[in-house]
Amino acid sequence: MGIKKHIPNSITCCNLISGCIATTFAFIGDAKLALCWIVIGAVFDFFDGMSARLLNVSSPIGKELDSLADDVTFGVAPATILFSELNVLEYPGPLLGIKDFIPYVAFLMAAFSALRLAKFNLDKRQTTSFIGLPTPANALFWGSLIVSNPSWIEGTSYSFAFLLAMLAISCYLLVSELPMFALKFKHWGWKDNEVKYCFAALSLICLVVFGIFEAWWIIISLYLLGSILLWWRAKA
């Protein structure tokens, strides 16, 4: 039991280390390797919770450690990717005087990710689904967007405004009350899992067609749209 109880927290620490490595690559402008380490961190994040359930071990420190690791991997790392991207964009003449300060706005993503994780820890409604955009989904969206569309993003002197508008939307979604489905299964049957299986299949198709790095922003966009449609249908 002595070793077994430390396994989930050890996996969580691997998530944290992955986030630190992702952040270092993001700072030097290597968004692709940063995204790679975010994906690795997401894998560790998936298995730390699974291992805790399978081994039937839990501790108060585990939940707090998981949130701290998640904010580094899914908050600080993607914020740094956006920071580096905003640093290399062109800015119109009137903003040249403050262009060195604009990239730091990207770190609002880390702050709102921390708020989202704190809210998740206290919210008893999020056992089988999510309320607000999960931080891993947000991180994968931003990392993939920057990796797959540099020419499109850097195409005009107003690309920064588009990215900042998207940043504002994603920060709002992180702490919003929008219900979002989760890939959490109580059983493996088709009934009650139709949306989850269809989304998983669609995600796999996107990964095959667009590539393991480029597909994620499309997948997360579909996830968001699907959640909104399900919410509207439930309200109707």
Predicted regions, residues:
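Active-site His/Glu-centered metal-binding helix of metallohydrolases
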Residues: 17, 43, 47-51, 68, ...
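Helix-coil boundary and interhelical linker segments in multi-pass alpha-helical membrane proteins
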Residues: 21-36, 78-104, 145-162, 209-213
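Multi-pass membrane catalytic core of lipid/isoprenoid biosynthesis enzymes
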Residues: 8-12, 54-118
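C-terminal membrane-associated helical module and adjoining short loops/tails
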Residues: 128-236
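Alpha-helical transmembrane segments of polytopic integral membrane proteins
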Residues: 20-23, 40, 78, 111-114, ...
